[in-house]
Swiss-Prot record:
ATP binds at R100, N101, E102, N109, E242, L243, G298. This is Elongation factor P--(R)-beta-lysine ligase. The keyword Ligase applies. InterPro entries: Aa-tRNA-synt_II, aa-tRNA-synth_II, aa-tRNA-synth_II/BPL/LPL, EpmA, Lys-tRNA-synth_II_C. Signal peptide: none annotated. Its EC number is 6.3.2.-. Homodimer. Belongs to the class-II aminoacyl-tRNA synthetase family. EpmA subfamily. It comes from Haemophilus influenzae (strain PittEE).
Amino acid sequence: MTALNHWQPSADIKNLLKRAKIIAEIRQFFTERGLLEVETPVLSEFGVTDLHLSTFSTEFLAPFGEQSKTLWLSTSPEYHMKRLLAAGSGPIFQISKVFRNEEAGNRHNPEFTMLEWYRPHFHMHRLINEVDDLLQQILDCPPAESLSYQFVFQEYVGLDPLSAERSELIEAARKHNFMAEDNEDRDTLLQFLFSEVVEPQIGKERPIAVYHFPSTQAALAQVSPEDQRVAERFEFYYKGLELANGFHELADAQEQRHRFELDNQQRQKCELPTREIDERFLAALEAGMPDASGVALGIDRLMMIALDCEKINDVISFAMDNA
């Protein structure tokens, strides 16, 4: 098909009209609760160290003879929004375009829309309740169920993810057609088993919040003071889709730097390029970000459920192959 006859939108106009109405409803939800809507840059001088995120880059040509520089397209507005929190913004939300140089398919588009919000002085479970409120309002769905990562993993894999021997995890992964090496990384095994065995079984009839992921998967979340084996991190699943990922946010600049450095060490082991650490973000943590919880929710996947669509292309105006 040539570009001349491949001009029409990916989604039906009626779906785009419904999408606009839902986004307006989301904005009203947060405005009525006293959150400030913010806008942060899509381009940044820093990428992300996360081993599992592939970032788009572009070159700023810097006119007037200045040296050009590489800029990175945002994978999430998280770092900038936390800088706003540290500056005293109070509770904030944002609906923004984000970019990940990864797969395109029925559930993924490299450019997508993310809703992200932060609540100073909220603990993790209070934010889980607010995500639940939003989903019930937008999707008219039953209240969410909250279960620990340890519980659902034991329920569907039959192993305790926090205490199982690596050999047991390898055996379980191989039963599910994962060609695990004898020295396979423990987190790789846990992530495979969770995504391939657990996720397809949960959130079918109602949303489910899975909380207390292993501390080795904390990312930017705090480790639980009650149990150092788990992080104060949660994810929401519904109708076969991962919808949201939230944290009781890590505010310790020294610990965050250490995690970034570990990310880069892992990148080197995997023969991936290292990423420069975002010193501005760490400076904001050092200055004092308030204790807060935050969450990112995929708007396009939310629309897939709200509009009963199987493909992400049916809820966005122009997919990557039609942009």
